[in-house]
Amino acid sequence: MIKEKILSIVAFCYGIAYSKLSEETKFIEDLSADSLSLIEMLDMISFEFNLRIDESALEHIITIGDLISVVKNSTKSI
């Protein structure tokens, strides 16, 4: 459920079909993400899951799989 919601948000933010995304998709290389778009996406995910993800976490989020891990770990600590 977490993975599906995150994939939906990423698809919406970057205007790409959900079916074209995977955990291996890289934000910068594959989606041409920049820091502003990543922060906006992180805000949407924080709102959706009712949690706070520190922007410093962006340094470690290279792929969608990395983002899923961060969200899963954040929801466990609530």
From Swiss-Prot:
PROSITE patterns: CARRIER. Residues 1-75 form the Carrier domain. It comes from the Bacteria. InterPro entries: ACP (IPR003231), ACP-like_sf (IPR036736), PP-bd_ACP (IPR009081). The keyword Cytoplasm applies. Keywords: Cytoplasm, Fatty acid biosynthesis, Fatty acid metabolism, Lipid biosynthesis, Lipid metabolism, Phosphopantetheine, Phosphoprotein, Plasmid. It holds the Pfam family PP-binding. It is found in: Cytoplasm. 4'-phosphopantetheine is transferred from CoA to a specific serine of apo-ACP by AcpS. This modification is essential for activity because fatty acids are bound in thioester linkage to the sulfhydryl of the prosthetic group. GO terms for cellular component: cytoplasm. Pathway: Lipid metabolism; fatty acid biosynthesis. The keyword Cytoplasm applies. One of its GO terms (molecular function) is acyl carrier activity. The modification O-(pantetheine 4'-phosphoryl)serine is found at S35. Carrier of the growing fatty acid chain in fatty acid biosynthesis. Belongs to the acyl carrier protein (ACP) family. This is Acyl carrier protein. It comes from Shigella flexneri. The gene is acpP.
